[in-house]
């Protein structure tokens, strides 16, 4: 008989991607909720990572990765490429003042700064691969949130035995706050997210995702013209 020595197998406590073991950072929902100063904005969360800096315009979340430009970043939501995931976006950039996504419906984010996966091409600086949560087949769940700039409502549940859904709607109150402070502009935004999944068979699932936002900017005509207002608008 042949004797075989004993072997001890221990799992690694760290989740590593086989395709991009070094250049990918995995952001969980707990990271999104607990990182201070980010206001649950997924673009602001990664600013503490090596090689990542922000636009010098303080109120925007444009990403500058490894010396690249703000337009060289690509975003994916459940494998679908999205040009920009922010409100009040500008042409030639990938950022904005606030994210269009409700973080309550995000399950995980993979942030690549190099060695991009073959099925996530089209970027020069970085890729942010966002995975949404799935609906709940056993119950209906609702959540209301009050953020620094908006109020929102999200829902997760099921429609029948084979269809699940997630949904979110948010409305900003910045226009009221800016008017109260006497600022010359009054920004306002609305966004919504809807995802439905229907199980057609054991191996096939139909998925529909809808994402949209409306941005509005008005001048506060109820204040007097002064040097401070002219400076802010310039």
Protein language model regions, located:
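Flexible loop and strand-edge segments within Gram-negative outer membrane beta-barrel domains
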Residues: 174, 205-234
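Short acidic/polar hinge/loop motifs at secondary-structure boundaries
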Residues: 63, 80-111
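A beta-strand signature from Gram-negative outer-membrane beta-barrel systems
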Residues: 48-50, 98-141, 152
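Extracytoplasmic beta-strand/coil segments of soluble accessory domains associated
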Residues: 34, 38, 43-84, 107-108
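Hydrophobic, lipid-facing positions within transmembrane beta-strands of outer-membrane proteins
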Residues: 61, 124-126, 140, 146-153, ...
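Outer-membrane beta-barrel channels and translocator barrels
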Residues: 106, 137, 160-162, 199-203
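Transmembrane beta-barrel strands of outer-membrane/channel proteins
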Residues: 6, 142-148, 167-173, 208-214
């Amino acid at each position: 008989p042949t004797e075989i020595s004993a072997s001890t197998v221990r799992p690694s406590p760290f989740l590593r991607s086989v395709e991009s073991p070094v250049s990918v950072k995995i952001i969980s929902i707990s990271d999104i909720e607990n990182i201070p100063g980010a206001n649950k904005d997924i673009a602001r969360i990664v600013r503490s990572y090596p090689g990542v800096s922000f636009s010098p315009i303080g109120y925007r979340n444009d990403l500058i990765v490894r010396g690249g430009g703000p337009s060289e970043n690509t975003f994916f939501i459940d494998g679908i490429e999205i040009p920009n995931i922010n409100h009040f976006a500008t042409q030639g950039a990938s950022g904005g003042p606030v994210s269009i996504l409700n973080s309550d419906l995000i399950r995980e984010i993979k942030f690549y700064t190099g060695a991009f996966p073959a099925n996530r091409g089209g970027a020069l600086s970085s890729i942010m691969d966002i995975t949404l949560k799935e609906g709940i087949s056993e119950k209906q769940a609702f959540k209301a949130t009050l953020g620094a700039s908006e109020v929102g409502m999200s829902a997760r549940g099921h429609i029948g035995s084979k269809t699940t859904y997630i949904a979110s709607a948010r409305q900003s109150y910045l226009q009221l706050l800016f008017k109260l402070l006497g600022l010359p502009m009054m920004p306002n935004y609305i966004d919504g997210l809807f995802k439905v999944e229907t199980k057609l068979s054991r191996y096939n699932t139909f998925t529909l995702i809808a994402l949209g936002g409306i941005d509005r900017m008005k001048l506060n005509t109820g204040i007097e013209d002064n040097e401070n207002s002219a400076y802010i608008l310039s």
